[in-house]
Amino acid sequence: TVIFQNPDDREQFVSSGLVKSEKCRVVNGSGVNTNRFSVADYPDKITFFMLSRVMYSKGIREYLRACELVKEKHPEVRFMLLGACENIQDSLSKEDLAPYVEKGIIEHFGETDRVEDYYKQCSVYVLPSYREGTPRTVLEAMSMGRAIITTDAPGCRETVIDGKTGFLVPVKNAEAVAEKMTEFIENPELIKTLGAASAEYAREKFSVDKVNDDMCCHLNIERTNKYAVV
């Protein structure tokens, strides 16, 4: 049995002849601990947040450009970025980020083991990634009652019901990200209505216990720990 976290990857492997379709099973990512990442109150100031390694493939350039575009018209809005800069070809450097921080466009934070403290500070979570398995950060933000802006890309599109729990945008399109940010700003009631639906969707589809049950079922393994903590 071969386990995939999204149907796009499954289809790619099957169509390439790497695995037979009858051997494949799809689970909903790695799941999210809905107890740890529980619904939290929203901040007073509208705040957008991205948590990611600061890599091109995660959509960091699109996020920064979208923040810049929206900040010009809505200087009161807050934009956060949590993630380390790495010395690899696909990553922005601290020097690349510096102008955005110095101009007050974004607030950049390093690494932390208390990511939920940052989710609590945001109104909407943003991940303009080019491709994922299933993005755990999106699941965590959903579980905490945050509406999502992410891409219509493999792994990402499965996490959002477009228009109900958040919005899907095209890959590599900063203007589309900015447009959806603006929609939340101009219609702030969407933050709570889509956020509540997002939390419900996380519990229905992505809770870690449900995902682990599916995984064990596919692999014919009996679960001994029903309360896995992730």
Residue ranges with predicted function:
Residues E11-Q12, R78-I105, F109, L190:
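Short, structured helix-loop element that forms part of the nucleotide-activated donor/catalytic region
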Residues A147-T150, V160:
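Short hydrophobic beta-strand element within catalytic cores of glycosyltransferases
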Residues D8-D9, V26-F37, R53-Y56, A84-N87, ...:
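Short beta-strand->alpha-helix junction loop in the catalytic core
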Residues D41-K58, Y63-E68, F79-L82:
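Conserved donor-binding/catalytic core segment of Leloir-type glycosyltransferases
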Residues T1-C24, G31-T34:
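A short, active-site helix/loop in glycosyltransferases that binds the activated sugar's phosphate group
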Residues A176, E183, L190-K205, V211-C217:
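A short, well-ordered alpha-helix in the C-terminal region of glycosyltransferases
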Residues D162-G163, F167-A174, E183-E189:
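Conserved acidic donor-binding segment of nucleotide-sugar-dependent glycosyltransferases
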Residues E111, Y130:
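Aromatic "clamp/platform" in nucleotide-sugar-dependent glycosyltransferases that forms part
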